[in-house]
Amino acid sequence: MYPATTPYETASGVGVAPVAGLFPVAGEAREWSSRLLDCFDDFDICCMTFWCPCITFGRTAEIVDHGMTSCGTSAALFALIQWLSGSQCTWAFSCTYRTRLRAQHGLPEAPCADFLVHLCCLHCALCQEYRELKARGYEPVLGWEFNAQRAAAGVAMCPPASQGMGR
């Protein structure tokens, strides 16, 4: 009666069916692929996050949001909150994405509550979340659309919506 998989809606409005391995499977219990303090495991991301945490956050947020908000929008909002609060309130915004990432991939709330991780170790948390997406097959630097298209290779996509009458 209902399809076995629910397509993810992309920013362009094209539905993409989840593909095993890339998109999460509900109910699977998993562990984080790296620890919170393993920042130097990916030195490029470590440096990017140290100098421009808004970019790391924006890339992660675009994937977690399934492309509903762009990297640029999320990064700009993060930077604005950081600037207005003097870097004191970004954790309150960014920890919500850690919670969503954990829910999507069945990850434990470890090593402590999401808000504490972001309050005490914001840069380490952003690096861990980015590394987690990479470990699960995403390429955050390329954005949601690319990742969704790559996952849909060989998978039937929904036909485009009717454009109506036109010349």
Curated annotation (Swiss-Prot):
Localisation per UniProt entry: Membrane
Keyword terms of this UniProt record: Membrane, Transmembrane, Transmembrane helix
Species for this entry: Zea mays
Membrane disposition: Single-pass membrane protein
One Gene Ontology cellular component annotation held by this UniProt entry: membrane
Tissue and organ expression note: Expressed only in pollen.
Protein name as catalogued: Cell number regulator 3
Regions crossing the membrane: 67-84
Main location: membrane
Highest taxon in the source lineage: Eukaryota
Family to which the UniProt record says this protein belongs: Belongs to the cornifelin family.
